[in-house]
Swiss-Prot record:
Record InterPro entries: NADH-quinone_OxRdatse_su_L
Membrane topology: Multi-pass membrane protein
Species this protein is from: Prochlorococcus marinus (strain MIT 9211)
EC number: 7.1.1.-
Chief place where the protein resides: membrane
Domain of life: Bacteria
Keyword line: Membrane, NAD, NADP, Plastoquinone, Quinone, Thylakoid, Translocase, Transmembrane, Transmembrane helix, Transport
Protein's name according to its UniProt entry: NAD(P)H-quinone oxidoreductase subunit L
Spans through the membrane: 10-30, 48-68
Keyword Transferase tagged: no
Length: 84
């Protein structure tokens, strides 16, 4: 009974590990390289779908964007120009 529980626990942990690795590493890297290859040739529908996938598979992106403030002088200058 205990060995069956340990075996099932390892199987579940392994499945979570594989799914997490796919979700956090493999699919985001694929999307990144796909966007680099297709950036200048995408149509509107493909771009819309890729943006949706980016927000789905980059879970930290929403969190980081809400707190990110550029610290470079060129970024502040561009923001100041855009606000006028």
């Amino acid at each position: 009974m205990a060995s069956q529980f340990a075996s099932n626990s390892l199987l579940v942990l392994g499945a979570y590990g594989i799914i997490g690795f796919l979700y956090l590493v493999v699919i985001p890297l694929f999307l990144y390289f796909w966007m680099n290859i297709r950036w200048n040739f995408m149509n509107k529908f493909e771009r819309l779908c890729l943006y949706g996938l980016v927000f789905l598979f980059f879970p930290w992106f929403d969190f980081i964007c809400s707190f990110f403030k550029p610290k470079n002088s060129w970024a502040r200058r561009d923001l100041a120009i855009d606000s006028h």
